[in-house]
Amino acid sequence: RKNGWGKEIPYKSPAKARKIEERTVFIIEYQDKVAIRKRPPKGLLASLYELPNIEGKTSGETVPQVLGLDREQVAWVELLPEAKHVFSHVEWHMTGYRVVLSQEEEPLSCFMVSREELEHTYALPNAFNAYTKLIG
């Protein structure tokens, strides 16, 4: 640039660091059904179906409360392995829980689908692969 070449040689500014987002993902099951929901029409993974999830990280003891359920509505909660998914500009660091319900409920604006419907009708984004492979 001192030589006056700065205007002739293109300069690529360094890439911004990806934003890290903590997320908690839930596999909510009742008998042979699994809860899913549709994402908002704008933003990341717009209008796609997903496993229910929330921003941030929560502990197993607070899962029923986070889902808006009473403890008697939840048969058990199992901590699942952590997972990571990298998008171009954001990175999800995910904690997962399997939540088995004692009665059919639809928390977090979800609806229940059979495992067969999940496999053949409702495609879930690759971001959830670490958890979708644990269903069924």
What is the meaning of each model-derived region?
Residues 1-136:
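Intrinsically disordered, low-complexity, charged terminal extensions of DNA damage-control enzymes
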